[in-house]
């Protein structure tokens, strides 16, 4: 796909058929249509008074969409991971890992001396993740069942926590971010990757987009400071935050 081009009719059909983005079980259900056709799980908390409603979470029944071939061009996962300062020996977390699309790519980057916690709120997603881990022999990937307000991660253990198209689905973002802040090392970083809410040409439902200003404002209120912003991906922001202690 050319970065600057709109999706073809065929591509739009893919979005309509299988809605998600790789996230917190949590893959969102991004699509041009206003009608979702993939199973979703309603946000577990009432709408927050922050100008938006948490998006619904895609069910594990639509998990095949997370590994669609088109995702390589649309989201450029390897370029994204190369830009977020991962290194051998790190302990990292893929929050809302789903079937492990990013976690399995992170595993060889941190290497045998590192580890990748792959968290998700759906046990069924973790079952599929464990199968993928076994097939790939990714012994340093550790599946973790998380919750709306609990990360399931050890305290002060994480160098980099990654949330790809996940944050906008959190039903209790303040509580979850507080738990995630506790899981980060003092110099740890939180990386948000979200579809650009500023760009109407991004063919994603509005509830599955965020403007950079909105994300930065909400993270600041939760005690995180923006330290880096990258905009080279076709459709998504990369926002890197440090916890304020």
Task: Annotate each PLM feature.
Residues 20-23:
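C-terminal motif of bacterial Sec signal peptides marking the signal peptidase cleavage site
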Residues 25-93:
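Class I SAM-dependent transferase core
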Residues 92, 161-162:
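Hydrophobic beta-strand segment of the Class I
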Residues 93-151:
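Class I SAM-dependent methyltransferase SAM/SAH-binding core
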Residues 107-108, 174-189:
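A short glycine-rich, Lys/Arg-flanked "PGG" loop and its adjoining helix->strand segment in the class I
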Residues 151-161:
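A short acidic, Gly/Pro-enriched loop at the edge of an enzyme's catalytic core
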Residues 189-216:
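Conserved class I S-adenosyl-L-methionine
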Residues 228-245:
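Core SAM-dependent methyltransferase catalytic element
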């Amino acid at each position: 796909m050319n970065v600057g081009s709109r999706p073809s009719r065929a591509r739009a059909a893919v979005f309509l058929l299988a809605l998600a983005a790789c996230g917190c079980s949590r893959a969102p259900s991004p699509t041009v249509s206003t009608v979702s056709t993939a199973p979703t799980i309603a946000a577990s908390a009432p709408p927050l008074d922050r100008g938006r409603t948490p998006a619904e979470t895609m069910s594990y029944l639509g998990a095949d969409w997370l590994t669609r071939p088109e995702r390589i061009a649309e989201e450029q996962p390897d370029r994204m991971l190369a830009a977020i300062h991962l290194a051998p020996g790190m302990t990292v977390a893929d929050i809302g890992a789903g079937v492990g699309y990013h976690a399995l790519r992170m595993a060889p980057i941190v290497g045998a001396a590192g580890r990748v916690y792959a968290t998700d709120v759906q046990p069924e997603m973790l079952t599929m993740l464990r199968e993928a881990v076994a097939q790939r022999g990714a012994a340093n990937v550790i599946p973790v069942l998380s919750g709306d307000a609990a990360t399931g991660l050890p305290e002060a253990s994480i160098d980099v926590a990654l949330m790809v198209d996940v944050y906008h689905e959190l039903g209790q973002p303040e509580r979850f971010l507080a738990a995630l802040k506790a899981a980060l090392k003092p110099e740890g970083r939180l990386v948000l990757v979200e579809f650009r809410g500023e760009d109407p040409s991004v063919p994603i439902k509005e509830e599955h987009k965020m403007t950079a200003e909105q994300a930065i404002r909400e993270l600041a209120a939760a005690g995180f400071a923006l330290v880096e912003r990258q905009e080279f991906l076709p459709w998504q922001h990369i926002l890197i935050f440090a916890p304020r202690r």
